[in-house]
Swiss-Prot record:
Family assignment from sequence similarity: Belongs to the PEPCase type 1 family.
Protein name: Phosphoenolpyruvate carboxylase
Gene encoding the protein: ppc
GO CC list: cytosol
Active site: 138, 545
Length: 878
């Protein structure tokens, strides 16, 4: 039998060997031998050898302070290199067909056009696709940008080494480059010295676009055009943009006091600066390429019959782009530059129109081959990225807007908005929205917090429409939450409609979402404002933390169904914005699968989805990977639109509702009602220590003095993934499945898993989480860190985990977890011998730091490295 993963293992082995050689050179043979000994003991321990486990623990506890950091670093870097090898394997020539599926768009077009779907319908759907991927800087991207660039260079070398035509000398050069890169990685500090600022996070997002997506977008569209042309003999429009990008980096101020209006302005300027700089590079290349003389009448008239008409136009654009960059540099340095608006690029049309004129002229002169090269690529980049690169969303908590209006009504002697009921609030807001006089007096001195909200609205109001995305209201629950934002935007002079998007996050708010939107749709003023277009955001992270994954998933599904129904009834075009995380406990998982498991009718050619933290790098970090991801999104949205999943049968709904009800009871019985739970959580996980890790710019808690409910979803998930119990991603689900099976519903569950994509996805995600959970490791954390009087809770949690595993295996009738997804299983098994020692060392270091009043710098750094290493190994941190 051919080993499907031979090339993957070979690359992992090569990178691991080079890392070992690097460590030997830096330290010595003895230290490398100790690392190898621990790795082999970890493998034996995982196969059930208790003696090996004890020997490994003895070795780990005997590490000196000086050995801690290089040891943690070695295992951490091996896991990062394993991730690189796996990432490369999916784009490698040697990738097995079970890992690298055929192009999903190609397959889908074949199914659709070979089936019952009319060609015109397929083309119409494709041309109107509106997929908006929203990049967010959640603090799950552990790796520093410096290292990420080196990891990309490693993949470049692996790609080069796949070329079978290389000479021996060329092979040696590429191997030398690999050794140099891995040495650079080894000698670079992995842990940031300080937390990134919101501007740093935004720059990280821009670097992903520059390094990968800038090339991937035209590559993907060229591939898509070719596929469509081969099957339909039709060319896609020049300005087609099925996928666009937005960002929360520098715009998401929910619970982040460091994101101010000043920061948001700087990020907007940086976005525009990056776009201008990259377009300038394209134009410089085009000046060299478009040296031809033949032109149509329009272009010749524009250039006064110049001998180099194309170059004349491009030189003018080059001059304007350089002036635009100079202008933005001045702004970023804090100056107020004085410029002639005609000298710089202000609008998308300033860039697009001259290039379209060149494109048309080339085609008219029989030079379509040239027109469809770099010039077409640039036009398609403009259609995707505009001149602002990313549309920036603003997110703010609903309470902050209410505070502004309450302070204002008190100042004006109109009463206290905070004490009014919903009906009174709506009446007041609608009256002011319809009023021709301003509400905010010129001499009003607002408190600092209120002033910051007003400044943000003023900034949003001053921006061009294409620079901004949506204004998202977190913790929205009532129509007044939306109307309050609209009033503030009106008062700050916003000249154009902005998408104001309620985010429904908790279980109660999800269940009430359709009532809230129905009430808004019933308001004539509001319907006039929206012009029949509405966006609603569904929160995954907080609903799962509130109710557990099973109940949250069903609440999200039913909320979407109801929102679709009321929007159709009101003749409103609804876009659903999915606030998914990278992990299962925050709604993560394969995007293709997730989109196809949405309720029928809920996608309808358009969707917004957050792309979080490290998942941005895993999906879009390399141009080839990004092309794959773009194809997956495109095919999934087309399929969900034209071949929607079936409506769930009444008995499936009834069963799912019962599962949700029982799972939320089981989940909350532990998280809310178990008096020792918070104490156990804080002791058994590195939750407290995570606060010291300089990951993201946002504080880990909404309130410093709060408990679990105030903890953000990301550190909540991150902490449980560190001790390998993965609790938020399964608690409550297995208990509900077992209860359903015991009351005779097993056959019904199996029918649902086979025929209902929504339920199949839920079970698939549970399987993956159960496979990653390690009860023996979590027990070791408990023994090392948790007071003995709390151990009963750990026993109960591990029993619940075992119940869930049994329930899923009974449902799927499989002998082992992930039996049907061998690639995922291989991925987990490849990493375990390297993650396990880091986990054991982490528990040891946590015990040490908690015992000692002041830990050494080495102990603290080693602890941070174990946290980063486990995160790299688990591949989905928060």
């Amino acid at each position: 039998m051919v080993d499907m993963y031979a090339s993957l293992r070979s690359n992992v082995g090569t990178l691991g060997q080079i890392l070992g050689d690097t460590i030997r050179t830096d330290l010595d043979d003895t230290f490398l031998e100790k690392i190898e000994q621990i790795r082999h003991l970890a493998k034996s321990s995982r196969q059930g050898d208790d003696a090996s486990r004890e020997e490994m623990l003895t070795l780990l506890s005997s590490l000196s302070d000086d050995e801690l950091v290089p040891f943690a670093k070695a295992f951490n870097q091996f896991l990062n290199l394993a991730n690189i090898a796996e990432q490369f394997h999916t784009i490698s020539r040697n990738c097995d067909e079970l890992v690298c599926v055929p192009d999903p768009v190609e397959q889908l077009l074949g199914r659709m056009l070979g089936g019952k779907i009319d060609q015109e319908k397929v083309l119409a759907c494709l041309k109107t696709l509106d997929i908006d991927l929203v990049l967010t800087a959640h603090p799950t991207e552990i790796s520093r940008r410096t290292l990420i660039q080196k990891y990309s260079a490693v993949i470049d070398s692996l790609t080069a080494l796949e070329n079978t035509q290389l000479t021996e000398q060329e092979k040696k050069q590429h191997h030398l480059r690999l050794r140099q890169l891995i040495a650079q990685i080894w000698h670079t500090n992995e842990i940031r010295n300080e937390r990134p600022t919101p501007v740093d996070e935004a720059r990280w997002g821009l670097s992903t676009i520059e390094a990968s997506l800038w090339q991937a977008i035209p590559d993907f569209l060229r591939q898509l055009n070719q596929q469509v042309e081969e099957r339909t003999n039709t060319q896609l429009p020049i300005d087609i943009a099925p996928v666009r990008f937005s960002s929360w980096m520098g715009g998401d101020r929910d619970g982040n006091p460091f994101v101010t209006s000043t920061v948001t302005q700087e990020v907007l300027d940086r976005n525009r600066h990056t776009a201008a700089r990259l377009y300038l590079k394209d134009v410089v290349l085009l000046v060299n390429e478009l040296s031809m003389e033949g032109a149509n009448e329009e272009l010749l008239a524009y250039c006064n019959n110049s001998n180099e008409p194309y170059r004349d136009v491009l030189r003018d654009l080059r001059k304007k782009l350089r002036a635009t960059i100079d202008y933005l540099n001045e702004k970023l340095e804090g100056h107020q530059p004085d410029v002639n608006p005609k000298d710089i690029i202000w609008h998308e049309s300033d860039l697009k129109d001259p290039l379209m004129m060149l494109y048309k002229s080339l085609c008219d002169q029989g030079m379509s081959l040239i027109a469809n090269g770099l010039l077409l690529d640039m036009l398609r980049r403009i259609a995707c990225f505009g001149i602002h690169m990313l549309r920036l969303d603003v997110r703010q908590d609903a309470q902050r807007h209410a505070d502004v209006i309450a302070e204002l009504t008190r100042y004006l002697g109109m009463g206290d908005y905070a004490h009014w009921d919903e009906s009174e609030k709506q009446s007041f807001l609608l009256r002011e929205l319809s009023s021709k006089r301003p509400l905010i007096p010129a001499n009003w001195q607002a408190s600092a917090e209120v002033e910051e909200v007003v400044k943000t609205c003023r900034l949003v109001a001053s921006q061009p429409a294409r620079a901004m995305g949506s204004y998202v209201i977190s913790m929205a629950s009532q129509p007044s939450d939306v109307l309050a934002v609209l009033l503030l935007l009106k008062e700050t002079g916003c000249p154009h409609p902005i998408r104001v998007v309620p985010l429904f996050e908790t279980l109660d708010d999800l269940n009430n979402a359709s009532n809230c939107m129905s009430a808004l749709f019933a308001i004539d003023w509001y319907r006039g404002y929206t012009k029949g277009i509405q966006e609603v955001m569904i929160g995954y992270s907080d609903s799962a933390k509130d109710a557990g994954v099973m109940a949250a998933a069903w609440a999200q599904y039913t909320a979407q169904e109801k929102l679709v129904a009321i929007s159709q009834e009101a003749n409103i075009k609804l876009t659903l914005f999915h606030g998914r995380g990278g992990t299962i406990g925050r709604g993560g998982g394969p995007a293709h699968q997730a989109i196809l498991s949405q309720p029928p009718g809920s996608v309808d050619g358009r969707i917004r989805v957050t792309e979080q933290g490290e998942m941005i790098r895993f999906k879009f970090g390399l141009p080839k990977l990004a092309v794959q991801s773009l194809a997956l999104y495109t095919s999934a949205v087309m399929e969900a639109t034209l071949l929607p999943p079936p409506e769930p049968k009444p008995e499936w709904r009834q069963c799912m509702q019962q599962l949700a009800d029982e799972s939320v009871v089981a989940y909350r019985a532990i998280v809310r009602e178990e008096p020792d739970f918070v104490s156990y959580f804080r002791a058994a996980t590195p939750e407290i220590e995570l606060g010291k890790l300089p990951l993201g710019s946002r504080p880990a808690k909404r309130r410093v003095d709060g408990g679990i409910e105030s903890l953000r979803a990301i550190p909540w998930i991150f902490a449980w993934s560190q001790n390998r119990l993965m609790l938020p991603a399964w608690l409550g689900a297995g208990e509900a499945l077992k209860a359903a099976s015991e009351r005779g519903d097993l056959a019904l569950l199996q029918e649902m898993e086979k025929h209902w994509p929504f339920f199949k996805t839920r079970i698939s995600m549970l399987e993956m989480v159960y496979a990653k959970a390690e009860p023996n490791l979590s027990k070791f954390y408990e023994t090392s860190l948790v007071p003995s009087e709390l151990h009963h809770l750990g026993v109960q949690l591990r029993e619940r985990l075992a119940t869930g595993v049994e329930a899923v295996l009974e449902l799927t009738q499989a002998e082992s977890l992930m039996a049907h997804t061998p690639w995922n299983r291989e991925s987990v098994e490849l990493r375990n011998p390297y993650i396990d020692p880091l986990n054991f060392l982490q528990a040891e270091l946590l015990a040490r730091t908690r015992r000692e009043e002041q830990s050494s710098q080495n102990v603290e750094l080693a602890l941070m490295l174990t946290i980063a290493g486990v995160a790299a190994g688990m591949r989905n941190t928060g």
